[in-house]
Amino acid sequence: MYALIEYKGKQYKAEKGAKLVVDKLSAESGSKIDIDTVLLISDGDKVTVGTPYVSGAKVSATVGDSFRERKIIVYKHKAKKNYHRTQGHRQAHTCITVDNIVG
């Protein structure tokens, strides 16, 4: 059984016991969250597609550790104008573990 969920504007395939890396959450590590924006649920041959969400369906997950990606460098340059800018960015993520899929 798996579900396609939408969380913070991105879509993820959630299966029981799967670990997902999502954008940073403000929830404490070890706390439980419920995600009710379920787009699709597949249980063997039975597939339920939402319009846009499946009513009554939810995914329960446990919040894990938060971490930051390695730094990427953003560089801007204008030819012949003596203009260049360098900026770094590190995206913050949180790991969640899917506990249960109800639907």
From Swiss-Prot:
Pfam families to which the protein is assigned, alphabetical: Ribosomal_L21p (PF00829)
GO cellular component: cytoplasm; ribonucleoprotein complex; ribosome
Alphabetically ordered keywords of this record: Ribonucleoprotein, Ribosomal protein, RNA-binding, rRNA-binding
Signal sequence extent: none
Gene Ontology biological process: translation
GO MF entries: rRNA binding; structural constituent of ribosome
Keyword Nucleotidyltransferase: no
Keyword RNA-binding: yes
HAMAP family from the UniProt entry: Ribosomal_bL21
Known function: This protein binds to 23S rRNA in the presence of protein L20.
Description of how the protein assembles with itself and partners: Part of the 50S ribosomal subunit. Contacts protein L20.
Family: Belongs to the bacterial ribosomal protein bL21 family.
UniProt xrefs under PANTHER family: 50S RIBOSOMAL PROTEIN L21, LARGE RIBOSOMAL SUBUNIT PROTEIN BL21M
Stated name of the protein: Large ribosomal subunit protein bL21
Native source species: Treponema denticola (strain ATCC 35405 / DSM 14222 / CIP 103919 / JCM 8153 / KCTC 15104)
